[in-house]
Structure formats: structure tokens, C-alpha cells
């Protein structure tokens, strides 16, 4: 009986401790254009510590001849470096959501939202 009571108390205190954790939240959004001939605008958007919007230019997926794999590679590098900087600053990647929008078959965007959290001090 004492063991069951002890286990119950441990479970209750760990649950309460987790429920009291307060988080800071930060979002980073990658918008990658799928407009032929590289005419679209692709950006990585976040906010700095002062609340100012920061836009990092990304390359468009398409050039005049089709998919530009070097641009895809460059965008992957920029996004990965940005995520690594967030980790270095104590942020944890909590959730990722992606979507695609296209008004017709020749244009559109890929959008990915990265939600980070950090425990408030």
C-alpha cells in the first residue's frame, strides 16, 4: 500500500511540475516560390530579439530551364543553418507545419512554419 501511495505522489508531482513550465515561443517561416523562370520571391522570415521582422532571401526553385537543384541545395543550407542558430540560442524545435498553395498548375508556393520554444527564465 505504501508503494502504491509513493508511486501516486511521484506521478502527481511530476505532472504538476510539467504543467507549471512556462515557454517562450518563436516562429520561423520558409516561403519558397514555384514560379517559372525564377520570377517568384522566396524568403525565410522570423523576428529578432527586438520584435523586428527579419527576412533572409532564399533562391527560387525554378530557373528558365526547370528545377534548379543548386537553388534547392542552397535553400536547404540556409534553413538548416538558421535552425542550428536557434538551437545554439537555446530554442527547441517544437513543431513543423508545411503546406502548398497554387492558384493554377504553373505557379505556387511551398510554405513551412517552424515553431520553436524555450523555457522562460
Residues covered by each model-derived region:
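Terminus-proximal functional modules
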Residues: 4, 8, 13, 18-121
